[in-house]
Amino acid sequence: MEVTDVRLRRVNTDGRMRAIASITLDHEFVVHDIRVIDGNNGLFVAMPSKRTPDGEFRDIAHPINSSTRGKIQDAVLNEYHRLGDSEALEYEEAGAS
């Protein structure tokens, strides 16, 4: 399995979310709403999730091994860093569609 495309939108938010990504796997399958989060130990990737009635977040889609998780995280963060903080980037308000 290879990440064959990454689309990234930076977001303006008071929280720790910095961007939302969509990835394509093997030119055949797309996963939307992957978040780039600025955590206590640096940036990390959070898979799409849904809040349960008891307030807990559950992943909707996620890799089942650390190697695949690493490939996804590397691809998304490489694109995030490649884009940099250029003023030419369009920022999107968090929650706006």
Curated annotation (Swiss-Prot):
Pfam families from the UniProt entry: SpoVG
Keywords carried by this UniProt record: Cell cycle, Cell division, Septation, Sporulation
Transmembrane portions of the chain: none
Keyword set includes Cell division: yes
A Gene Ontology biological process term: division septum assembly
Function noted in UniProt: Essential for sporulation. Interferes with or is a negative regulator of the pathway leading to asymmetric septation.
Family according to the record: Belongs to the SpoVG family.
HAMAP family for the chain: SpoVG
Protein's UniProt name: Putative septation protein SpoVG
Highest classification ranks of the organism: Bacteria, Bacillati, Bacillota, Bacilli, Bacillales
